[in-house]
């Protein structure tokens, strides 16, 4: 089904396709022009990495809701974030742009300048009822960027309140302030479609120690990632991570039940994904797959054939243009993301679009745990066969200065690796996660899927490395990345708002 056939089948006319953020009065009231448009339920976990879902093959974690969405929709095996860090990753999702284009928004604990258009605002102008609960864009502050609410829209207490057609008494107006924490009393206009962001705080640390084991998980069943040492302490930590993944999955299941009760389940495009990889050494805040590859499943039975597994590369920055196109709007000209509506509606599995053969990722400042508050800038290109990483400041410590290695979240696994760093089974893994790195890294995924053996200096890979480096720099220059234009130090000069920030905006 091509785009024209799709919109004709779904009753979205040509006039709707021409919308660029403007809506008629009838649309704002939820008039006839909106009746054919789907709802959008976007569910994002905090630090959920591929392949930690039962449908992806994990033998311990149980994710029946994600499995259902994937079985009844499309499971994407190669979905990647723009950055393996909360704030820039979520900014890229909302704007449909690479995070390096977002100025301050390219860093953790920052602000997202108001000049960057976000898809919820466009949908709201087109008549959609929008909002979020819990963690949306962030952590960071709205006001320094010129915003009066979170970029994801007004905050609601929960999904039930959001769906109500009348205002809720005794609630705070708007979502303004640091992190947009005020509770909205905005009522859903009758007949209006909605776009809702459910942002769980799971499975972000801290965890309750042994919560996974106490729930019945067995540490001997855990498949320990090759980048981590195999110990009971690490295995127990992973089980605790699994327990929070399961809690996220359960809560999304409750949202689906609510939609079914209201008769809106099958006219809602449902997305389940994560904002970056798991919070363990050499995972989150790194450009290896455990930091950037996230689960992604999309269900929309009205238009998307289910039971499919797609191998195409998808960037989560592709979501914004996809949402806009699904709703009959054109993506804005500054979006670098590319709609994958054609992949969703193709009915195909495997490799669908030959052009989706690679993805780009990057990283700027995560924590401020280096002298001078600087980051560890990286960019990468990931193809089916290779991962190439360019480290722009190899003299810096990628995990943060050794006083605390602050770019790695505190955890029992981190503690174990630091305390046992000189032992034979830990020493090399510690150096890979905590030590300095060369300017270039290259991993042959056909031989090294765990990305532990850097072959960048081997002569037999010289041509492949040169080709990948050229493709990476071409994309960075085409999208005006300051790092590729000799202006990358600007990221280290932007304010860091993490120190003393309120806990509820994390």
Indicate residue ranges for each PLM-predicted region.
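Formylglycine-dependent sulfatase
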Residues: 2-441, 449-470, 474-477, 481-484, ...
